[in-house]
Amino acid sequence: MILVLASLFAVLILNVLLWRWLKASACKAQRLPPGPPRLPILGNLLQLGPLPHRDLASLCDKYGPLVYLRLGNVDAITTNDPDTIREILLRQDDVFSSRPKTLAAVHLAYGCGDVALAPMGPHWKRMRRICMEHLLTTKRLESFTTQRAEEARYLIRDVFKRSETGKPINLKEVLGAFSMNNVTRMLLGKQFFGPGSLVSPKEAQEFLHITHKLFWLLGVIYLGDYLPFWRWVDPSGCEKEMRDVEKRVDEFHTKIIDEHRRAKLEDEDKNGDMDFVDVLLSLPGENGKAHMEDVEIKALIQDMIAAATDTSAVTNEWAMAEAIKQPRVMRKIQEELDNVVGSNRMVDESDLVHLNYLRCVVRETFRMHPAGPFLIPHESVRATTINGYYIPAKTRVFINTHGLGRNTKIWDDVEDFRPERHWPVEGSGRVEISHGPDFKILPFSAGKRKCPGAPLGVTMVLMALARLFHCFEWSSPGNIDTVEVYGMTMPKAKPLRAIAKPRLAAHLYT
């Protein structure tokens, strides 16, 4: 029996090796992009370290704007070149707009049933249409203006209270709570932090922790996605951790949906103050069903919470860190705020379009510290060519936005935080926080997969920064490091701690 099993296993291995040899031979007949030498079976996996975005940028420096890699049994390309990125995301959007079905996406995005991680197809189109037509419309977002203003007030009161101790404030914690509250009030109709919270501090911190954990797992380069046999051993317990987070997140989502259904039964006339979950529960399902499936609602809830919370908080923390490191930048931000807003009132959302220097600060933050170092990887649905090179079907695409912002061919002094480089040439007009026609920064992707929540994300980032710099002077108790941690987002390795000193009249903080 053992001999038979061993023989079958040997035949299986030989078939796999033969298939890979035939595929490699077919690819060699075409001209693949240049890239580093590859090891048998592993390919280039060993060349990816703890900060793979920096590793891949180094490969682009060595081999050119488009680099081919073999990651285990997966073809992959990477680029940090604006023209190549434009080719992938716009000109060949129909080829590259799908997503790879990673184990993290299967476990943590309801079988890739969401918007962000779903492969291209009818399901993705339907889910994105729901977001764009029912959740992220201008009218719907404007209906939450009052709630966002309240959260901005709570943010300042929280920091003011902490500042009275004279001790450094953990800005990662403060900014995370601000982002979380903004999102959960729109999405779920309740706060998790602050005076209006109806949940215990322990539950709130657990929710924030599990959200960060989920986002980290979604971004991790898991060997089981590239070497199927790795899943049999899973020595680091990564897939086990995914299943654990999957279970805990699903329990939370089930509780949220049940709460909303009970509330609807108790108040059948509710129609004015509808949060996103209320809207989703009111929509018809597919194929004539009366309502959307719970799993679809959960997938959309997860997308909104994870994406909007983590990316905004990470961007704000980096912007604060860079501005506090450079008092010159902070002074220019505050001069603009004093000119536009004055010192007798707080910043409103209507002021944000007039804060061009602050918008330059955010653009420069996106250049140096993009929230997503690889965006979300794309996958080709069929074979194609880029820059004259053959790209096989099902090639994984890593668009290196971190490398893009530090590409010395398009930026000078790449390690210097200099917001002035984004100032309009004409000296007037609003500074746009998007990729623009030159594709020199890419905060929200482009093409079919462009982030549908970009306008909301920009508003949340600008409002937090405007309020914090308008209301307080900031200083650091020591040196501020700029070491990052890799994941789907790219936070600081050490939370930012800074000392706040109020700069406005005391009555404005109450």
Swiss-Prot record:
Transmembrane segments: 2-22
Keyword Acyltransferase: no
Summary of the knockout phenotype: Impaired pollen development and partial male-sterile phenotype.
Enzyme type, top EC level: oxidoreductase
Molecular function terms, GO-annotated: fatty acid in-chain hydroxylase activity; heme binding; iron ion binding; oxidoreductase activity, acting on paired donors, with incorporation or reduction of molecular oxygen, NAD(P)H as one donor, and incorporation of one atom of oxygen
Residues at which heme binds: C451
Family: Belongs to the cytochrome P450 family.
General function of this protein: Involved in pollen wall development. In-chain hydroxylated fatty acids, together with omega-hydroxylated fatty acids, are key monomeric aliphatic building blocks for sporopollenin synthesis during exine formation.
Protein name as annotated: Cytochrome P450 703A2
Organism: Arabidopsis thaliana (Mouse-ear cress)
